[in-house]
Amino acid sequence: MAHAPASCPSSRNSGDGDKGKPRKVALITGITGQDGSYLAEFLLEKGYEVHGIVRRSSSFNTGRIEHLYKNPQAHIEGNMKLHYGDLTDSTCLVKIINEVKPTEIYNLGAQSHVKISFDLAEYTADVDGVGTLRLLDAIKTCGLINSVKFYQASTSELYGKVQEIPQKETTPFYPRSPYGAAKLYAYWIVVNFREAYNLFAVNGILFNHESPRRGANFVTRKISRSVAKIYLGQLECFSLGNLDAKRDWGHAKDYVEAMWLMLQNDEPEDFVIATGEVHSVREFVEKSFMHIGKTIVWEGKNENEVGRCKETGKIHVTVDLKYYRPTEVDFLQGDCSKAQQKLNWKPRVAFDELVREMVQADVELMRTNPNA
């Protein structure tokens, strides 16, 4: 049943024992998304008071944080509150920030689907680009420049048509989508506020990161869901776009820790977060099928290519040109050596483990709820 944002009672003792402790209050945009839900969990475990901004909709999409929202007693200390708001509404952002007075803001909210950004270019620019400016301006309006730390979810899509391999903090940007271009504006306005107003503001240039909580319209989750359905006999075949696109894939749970570490750093700096390993969409498909005991062999070329099950002879994968982007990003590989050195961060979950976790989770999900 949908329920409106409201404060959850906390198990934290708010008596004299808390006096003298520094305030740990986080505000997260995009809290209902993959990264936001993992970050909320992470911060609650660290004793933060967590506030999230959610958009009003007829279907209240809090599925990824429902376990936190309903049962805050599971945490030793800390609590959570959700607020209606939108990155396109300056007034509500000022109101929420002034009320919450956060010590850390994590801007994860975005129209984050690259392919869809070609169809919703203006909206993507408004939310992902100008929305970041609205948040930064709200911090300034509320007089919190000297008391808040700001994390901006930047993206490897900034590199687009890559200018060097691997990509690091100093690699020139060349975005290849409205999403990448909007995020480029957000990146530079964060740098500008840091330099102009001395705001502790950082960009986390995160390469692709996945999990069982990944949105169903992203390629990795589309693969894991489809493979699970094939395993359960609910589906025979699914279509993909560019099988040879290569990405640096990590686990979202590892990457939210890096976000937090950036705000605990002595100085505000931008960091690339990645695994340094590259795998193709084709490999993701092959690994996924391996976890259900099937071997995929490829036949044909380009849009006529198919993935056939070696054991049964059935075609399970086809290529559809409609899933190609107008301008493709063929290869992304991150160099996170700066984060390893300065933040002592490194990825924990290996590619094979990530794929297995996603397929297993979707097998369980599709078994209990085929229409999920």
Curated annotation (Swiss-Prot):
Database matches in Pfam families: GDP_Man_Dehyd
Region of interest called Disordered, as start-end residue ranges on this chain: 1-22
UniProt EC number: 4.2.1.47
Gene3D superfamilies the record matches: NAD(P)-binding Rossmann-like Domain, UDP-galactose 4-epimerase, domain 1
Modified residues (N-acetylalanine): 2
Protein activity control: Inhibited by GDP-fucose.
Keywords on record: Acetylation, Lyase, NADP, Phosphoprotein
Cofactor(s) this protein requires: NADP(+)
InterPro entries registered for this protein in UniProt: GDP_Man_deHydtase, NAD(P)-bd_dom, NAD(P)-bd_dom_sf
Gene Ontology molecular function, alphabetical: GDP-mannose 4,6-dehydratase activity; identical protein binding; NADP+ binding
Residues with Phosphotyrosine modification: 323
Catalytic activity reported: GDP-alpha-D-mannose = GDP-4-dehydro-alpha-D-rhamnose + H2O
The keyword Transferase appears for this protein: no
HAMAP family: GDP_Man_dehydratase
Function: Catalyzes the conversion of GDP-D-mannose to GDP-4-dehydro-6-deoxy-D-mannose.
Cross-referenced PANTHER family: GDP-MANNOSE 4,6 DEHYDRATASE, GDP-MANNOSE 4,6-DEHYDRATASE
Name this polypeptide is given: GDP-mannose 4,6 dehydratase
UniProt organism field: Cricetulus griseus
UniProt gene name: GMDS
